[in-house]
Amino acid sequence: MHDYLGSFYNPLTLQKKLKYIHHIIINYITNSILYFFLIMQSKNNPKHNSMKFKEQTESPILNQSKLVNTLDIIKDEINKWEEKNTDKDIKIVSIDNGKIVLSMVYGKQHIIEILCPKDYPNVKSGFSCKEIKTVNTIPLSFISQANNQLKSKKNLSVHRIISHLSTTFQNYKKALKSKVSKDKMKDKSESNSEHEQESKSVVSNEIPSEVSIDSKLTKDINFINDLIKEANKCSNDVPSDSDETHQEVDDRPLTEEVVVPDPTRIVRRRNSKLQTGSTKIKIFGKSKNSGPSSSKTSISSMSKVEELEDKNPYLQEQDIMSIIQDEWNKVQESKSICPTTNEDNNDLDNLINEVERLVQETKDQETKDQETKDQKEIWASSLTIEEPNGENFEEFSWEVPNETSQITVVEPVQEATEEPVQNVTEELIQLVADEPVQETVKDSVQEVAEESVQETTVEAVQEIAEESVQQVVEESVQETTVEPVQEVAEEAVQQVVEESVQETTVEPVQEVAEEPVQQEVAEEPVQQEVAEEPVQQEVAEEPVQEVAEEPVQKATEELVQQEVAEDIVKLDVTVQNDFSDHSDSPEPSDSSDSEEEITNSNNLGRYFKIYDPTTGKTTGVYVGKTPTQAANKAFIKTFSNDNTGNKKEFYLQEYTGNKPGKIYKYEGTRQKLNQPQKISIPLYGDGQYKTITYNYKNTVVKKNVPDSIKNPPKTIKKSIKPVKKSIKPVKKLSTTKLDSQTNSVKEKSENKDIINYNDTGDKYGLYIDFGKFFKNSKIPFDLEKLRDNALKLSNQENQDDNYSTMKLRNFKNNNAVNLMINDFTKLYNDGVKNGYNIEPVNNNIYDLDILLSSNFLDKDSVLYQDMINLKIDHIKINIKINHKMYPFYPPQVSLIRPTIENNVAAIIATIDYLFANKWNPMISIVNIVNDIRNILNKYGALDEKKYQNNLDPIFHDLVELSLLTGTQCSMYQSDQKVIDLSNNSTNEKQSKYWKKGTGFGHSGLSDWDFNQTKENIKNRELKIYQCLRKIVVKLTKIILGKNQVDVINILKESCFIPYLKLVFIDGSLFDLVKDLSYFELVLNSMRILTKEYLPLFLHKYNDKSLLEVLDQFNKDCHSYLNTLKNIKESDCQNEIDIIENFMSFYKRLSTSIEKFNEITESNNKEEVISNDVKDLYKITLGNEVFQEYNLDLNKFANMLTNDTKKEGLIHKDALKAISRELLSHSKNLPVEYGSSIYYRYSPENIRYHEFIITGPEDSPYDSGCFHFRMYNPSAYPNTSPFVSMTTTGHGSVRFNPNLYADGKVCLSILGTWRGQAGESWIPGVSSMLQVMISIQSLVLISEPYFNEPGYESSRGTDKGNKLSTEYNQKVRFNCMKWAMIDVIKNPVPGFESMIKKHFSIKAPHIKQVCQTWINEAPDNNKSEYQKLYDELIGLLDSLVA
């Protein structure tokens, strides 16, 4: 057997030792992985994670509000950072329960986790950050450095931590890029030097196995060879023939025999040791001087290592390397004498290859470690942090400890990290440069090119060319040019020609006579000239109606279709001062004998330009007489050939040559504009006319007029007589005669030239464009681009939008955008006229800036003079429109600048119809701008010292709170009609013969969606909570920061105090304890106010101050705490705590107000009792409405039969619900002279209740007292209470179809009758108060007969009225007997005082009512009525006495 401890270069020995080293490395890696998992397991243990452990043990109910507040504050700070962040490589991934996850991308993604302290922002220390390790990603070293700094710093915030991490990451990227460029230059120089050395080196031929490799690889191999030789030395002194030793070496774990340091440490040490060495090393395959080393030396060196290991199991790198270096030096001193064979050489080559593989693996690990070291080197000196002084601090930055700086900045690292850093950085740069850029370019370019261009070009062209154009050519043009000419030439035209020629010219000219005739007959200006004489008008009407009726209708229909497609909507725009500043000359064209070319607009006489405000173009020219009205008033010109009634408003501007004049309103259709026109225009002062032919798009007709029209027969002039006889033949024209005349005209003109539309630029004759004569005032916006942006915005899903979209389900996005484009066009045209401009913000028509100039205001207003004096160009208003809800939801209007006095900004933002429940969809943006003008004229004024100040952000939050809660702080009431969108008109039309809620006759009718309503209320409350929270945060910053903001006046003029009154009056404690977080937020909004804000609590809004409201609420809190005395503290401790906090706050507030020297004490109030009996009744019986009383529970025995848990204790949830409702009863029960509800409950057992309802006026129950008992079952409030009536004449009287003689009350809310879902009992919503109000208003009514099922159909009939009267007479009699006399004689226990006061004060009214009942009673019952009346009078007199 070959000796195991043979020569160092023995192949077998080397293989074993190589396996030995390989085994050491594998064991090291395995132990490292095991150690890593042990660490992770310890970190995941909840006992070692204090934050997670505490979160699990704490009660979620107690921490719910804190978590919500903490999460909201963190989100606000992150939103601030995102607004300023410009680095796209840094993004927020998630936010969850104080954990923030960041993503930093530079070639590869780094996931950073930031943990906030539990009580943040109250606690601003204890932050931590770490990088989540991912595969093939080298961690960022500055993250661990930052984590060390976070643990020792105080007064930190999420915003600052994220900001500095992002700044550090940006610096890291810059430094890494600069380092890469330097390394590349350095590598080039080293490669050149190495190439020169290689050319000079000579390899010895005496060593055939010598291998030349890369310098760095050679260093690695030599270093491993050193390690192998050291291991060989340790084993040379052991005898080879010892079986025990040999067995021990083979069987024992190799890791126990020799201690080998971490390979990564060895490589790093090798780098430093070989830094100054040569770049080329020879590897010897054989050596004559090689031999075994001294056994004593090997044993001593091995013992040194083992001795150190025993003392310190974690050997330091320096100690191990020093031992290895010493032993290596000793080995070099001794020469090997054992020659090697060829087999040894081959084995050595294999060994070298294996060593190279191991070195490469070590090299990869070295690269990662070195890059981490480079990061530390880059940021070791640049990252510093300054400890903030106290609470006021600005910024901080990371600081690297001194020890870390000394370790990371090592000179030998430079050479070793040259090549690895290059490889890593090159890959990083390529990823960043290649992938994101290509994706962005492809997506954006292709979408824009494909979508916008193709859609617009295809749709617009096809619709105009195919549908509307062809029909007009076939029907309208040909028929009108053939048929009307014949009739006019024979009869109708004769009279017209005579009048027109005589009036217009002294010497008739054929050309002048011909063309007006053709125009007047076919296009109908005839009425204007002939209107003065009745005979001529009659003659002209009939032929036009008979001949031109059908063609005109067809043409009009087609044009209307085209107009809808082209023009979005009819505009109601008033007249501008001028349509154009100058006019252009038309293009020259050919002319004939009967027409003259227009070469200069100055040659034109007096005429009118027709302007269409919808399209923004001039559509024609009109020539005619100016009306007799004043020149500055609008007049209407109607085309007589428009029989369809489809009219449209245009404007006429008078021109003389090219000089514009006055403007008139014009109404008509485009029918007239679809034909070429020959117009006579008077020239300057010479009494002559010039005839011009206009066609569409400024093209003059080139063809000659037919001879039959140019040279009319002489009989035309001779036969013109203004005699009525000529009218008769016109009316009696037969169709056959008309056909023959038409055929003859066609034959005559068959071979002659006529006016041909194909000769013009627009062959179909759809448009007349006089753009060369006039300047078009087009809208200076790209409407197509605005439309595309609006469509994209409308198609996006908005998850923050929680408003109901029920009315928009059938309203398509395209229609909504078209509607908005219309309003935008209207707004622009109105602004041109009234002196304001509009600017879409980022080409978004749903976000508009309105710039109001001084001309927008009345010149006698204060604000107008202030703008002139202070040289203010405009007032900026912003209008934001909800793109998903428009026009069914109001826009948001805000004043941007300047600051205007008298709280104008709040008035503008809270105009009455801008509230959601008062919005009218018919109100346009133009209406809103007009109301803004009225507000500015009435209230606007500027303070030269304050007008440049910007509005504080808290102002906008207060406006939002006003709009959400409906608390209007504005003194302005708009003239616009405000409507209720609750479909009241529809409900009135339904034929209902019963009172809603009684439980009868609802089969087949529509029902309201309770779940949808509940969801809407929930969303609204959430928005209110978020808005109020922002106000509290900003108000706290203003108060603590002592900012120079007049917050007191802002709060006084806003809805803040009215809203708090609304919360504590209408909301009451019953609603507030349902949401403790909201209750606490409202309480905090008052607790943060200092003594300077005390006048706000004393200011009276609607005759009541906030202090008075809080005083009553404080009493309710005392009462509520008393009702909870039977409940364990743990069951409702949160409610008790928040109520006690309020009571403590109110105590401090009242104490501060007592010391306030500017107010009077609230106790010095004078109680004024009105002489009016109604006020006396309310004041006297106000204290009788709600009282405690020890009720006789035995009388409720018949109501307990239906309770499943009669003898069991009441559930704590039911007790809490009843306690809350009792608070509501104390302030919400009605006490009125007409009808009241008086309530008693047992303080010992609040499940038992009694109440009396006094009968409403004008009913058969008037002023009677009706007694009820109510019991809350064990399942309350999930089920309705049990109600029974006791005023039944001892079970003999039924007062109402819903009130039975046995005491049963039939109502759908009580589950005793079927009803709609919204009328049934709804847990958590319905209450005992609702039950009592339902009985008062829906059962005790004026006509109870119709509450009977089946009788409602007879309402309004004679029979039904008669039966109802008879039923009421019985009810009146029983009301006197049992609800008045019996109650006075036998008052209900607990209501004695109330009954006496009630009948005493209402005695005169009761006597009068009962006397009326007697008079209306039937004769056979009057005596019985009289007996009851006499007895009642005696009882009433005794009470009054």
UniProtKB/Swiss-Prot annotation:
Catalyzes the covalent attachment of ubiquitin to other proteins. One of its GO terms (biological process) is DNA protection. One of its GO terms (molecular function) is ubiquitin conjugating enzyme activity. Pathway: Protein modification; protein ubiquitination. Gene3D superfamilies: Chromosomal protein MC1 (3.10.470.10), Ubiquitin Conjugating Enzyme (3.10.110.10). It catalyses: S-ubiquitinyl-[E1 ubiquitin-activating enzyme]-L-cysteine + [E2 ubiquitin-conjugating enzyme]-L-cysteine = [E1 ubiquitin-activating enzyme]-L-cysteine + S-ubiquitinyl-[E2 ubiquitin-conjugating enzyme]-L-cysteine. This is Probable ubiquitin-conjugating enzyme E2 R521. Keywords: ATP-binding, Coiled coil, Membrane, Nucleotide-binding, Transferase, Transmembrane, Transmembrane helix, Ubl conjugation pathway. Residues 1217-1380 form the UBC core domain. Residues 539-549 have a biased composition (Acidic residues). Its EC number is 2.3.2.23. GO terms for cellular component: membrane. It is an enzyme of class 2 (transferase). It comes from Acanthamoeba polyphaga mimivirus.
